[in-house]
Amino acid sequence: MSFDQVIADALQALRSRFGADILSEQATGEGFPVLWLAAPAWEAAHRFLREEISAPFPLLADLWAIDESQRQHRAGQPASRLTLCSHLVSLERNADLRLKLATDGRAPSVAGVYANADWYEREAHDMFGLDFGRETRRLLMPPTWEGHPLLKTHYARATEKPPFVLTDRLFEAEERATITDPDLLGLPGLRDGEELMVLNFGPHHPSTHGVFRILLGLDGEEVVWAWPDIGYHHRGVEKMAERQTWHGFIPYCDRVDYLGGVISELPYLLAVERLCGIAVPPRAQMIRVMLCEFYRIMNHLLFYGTMAQDVGAMSPVFYMFTDREKGHEILNAITGARMHPAFFRIGGVAMDLPRGWDAMVRDFLDWMPGRLDEYERMVLRSELFRARTVGVGAYDTDTALTWGTTGPGLRATGCNWDLRKQRPYCGYEQFDFEVPLGQRGDIFDRTRVRADEMRESLKIIRQCLENMPEGAVKADHPLTTPPPRGAMQTDIETLIAHFLQSSWGTVVPAGEATGQIEGHRGLTQYAIVSDGGTQSYRTRIRTPSFAHLQMIPEIVPGMTVADLVAHIASIDFVMSDVDR
């Protein structure tokens, strides 16, 4: 059955069930349907797609809002002040579906259908003031924050406000606001008549791997309940995207996940290139793939070492950092930077590979397999490591999808879902590699999957080395490349266009587009809205870490605090990826 037939079947089922409540189908060129629903059908349609339809949509990949108040190009769309969007994925169909709801600031909740919608709706309330008809606390902003930052009326720069002065009264108010009462959160204070100890784990604790707090209810060493508290690392990157040029936002992508390097640049650029109709040359595609796999290895080495360290093995992390240094030397030689290269460009990459790159890469490929063999002996075959990880923090595929888990955390349950295979991009269909899978979905399997993924990344990099095509590293397109100098000297229109693009910025056609990749942590997705200007009207960044942390209260009750530390390490997150 073709993709069109698969998705047509789902659309027909929706139309048969909801009829006139489907207001319109938006033409976006996304490659998946975008449907506008009436408010009364919002929750019911989500429940139908998740629970009742054949080949359901069990994964709520993202849910976000758009402030439409200043948007000029939205012909054919229902009138809306705030638009609510949900992005659903059916693994069985290998298909996506986006639903939209026009609101006046109030929307039905789908948290009773998709458990992971809770944080997404709290974020939409926090950023846009959307009222979901239930109690919603701020998620990313401090509880004392005034206003909703992603509204177009909210300031974007500190200079738009009077200078900040921390008075004694303000300090006391901020301090009081940090107090979290478990009773107000509906968390029990007693167990079998005995009072639980409430412990603040973080936000400044080495085992939280960043500024992340978990409020714990403990009965001795046993975790009875856990309440994650995020937002301490929030920088407002989606707001920044609205005041940067399309090219100027690329360096900010590196900071969304500061260990991923160019990986976070790729989905953003795929979205922009889709909107502009830009075809990336084969050599640039393969350079992109090679660098993404290098950064996948760099991230997994850091995970591998710190995972072992968090269960008591001190040596591996030092060996693995030595190998990361070798990899970063290659990345520095190719991109000019180690961790934040800002190397990809709309239509390709910033520059061609340097002289001697192949010898450096070949040396690394010859070096690493033996090192990975040694790490397997040190870590995965260690009886102590296995005792601390096998059967601990286990969950199944259904639980993973319920909470929006993707990437190694999903594949550790045995679910074979990797966008590089299921929906190849950047030419991944040309490469021969396997998708490592686990069986139990426990801490050990999550570690094993990432260890095996490094071997597969080495295979992909070697194929890039041996099959790197000749040719351009950037598309010959007016939105990506300056025109020939000779044309500028003879044609005034060409000169004017070049001047405007260099000074004012690239103008991207009005519309919507989405870029998806299999990042080192899971599904990374950028959904962009252009209003026909030099800046994004709305950039929505779906990061895997955000979804993965929300799952903690489901998994950790019954664990000891020591096992909680191991479980947190096995998630493999960075708080910049969570808080954005």
UniProtKB/Swiss-Prot annotation:
One of its GO terms (cellular component) is NADH dehydrogenase complex. It comes from the Bacteria. InterPro entries: NADH_DH_suCD, NADH_Q_OxRdtase_suD, NADH_quin_OxRdtase_su_C/D-like, NADH_UbQ_OxRdtase_30kDa_su, NADH_UbQ_OxRdtase_49kDa_CS, NDH1_su_D/H, NiFe-Hase_large. It is a peripheral membrane protein. Keywords: Cell inner membrane, Cell membrane, Membrane, Multifunctional enzyme, NAD, Quinone, Translocase, Transport, Ubiquinone. Residues 195-580 are annotated as: NADH dehydrogenase I subunit D. Residues 1-171 are annotated as: NADH dehydrogenase I subunit C. PROSITE patterns: COMPLEX1_49K. It catalyses: a quinone + NADH + 5 H(+)(in) = a quinol + NAD(+) + 4 H(+)(out). One of its GO terms (molecular function) is NAD binding. Its EC number is 7.1.1.-. It is found in: Cell inner membrane. NDH-1 is composed of 13 different subunits. Subunits NuoB, CD, E, F, and G constitute the peripheral sector of the complex. In the N-terminal section; belongs to the complex I 30 kDa subunit family. NDH-1 shuttles electrons from NADH, via FMN and iron-sulfur (Fe-S) centers, to quinones in the respiratory chain. The immediate electron acceptor for the enzyme in this species is believed to be ubiquinone. Couples the redox reaction to proton translocation (for every two electrons transferred, four hydrogen ions are translocated across the cytoplasmic membrane), and thus conserves the redox energy in a proton gradient. This is NADH-quinone oxidoreductase subunit C/D. It comes from Cereibacter sphaeroides (strain ATCC 17025 / ATH 2.4.3) (Rhodobacter sphaeroides). The lineage of its organism: Bacteria, Pseudomonadati, Pseudomonadota, Alphaproteobacteria, Rhodobacterales.
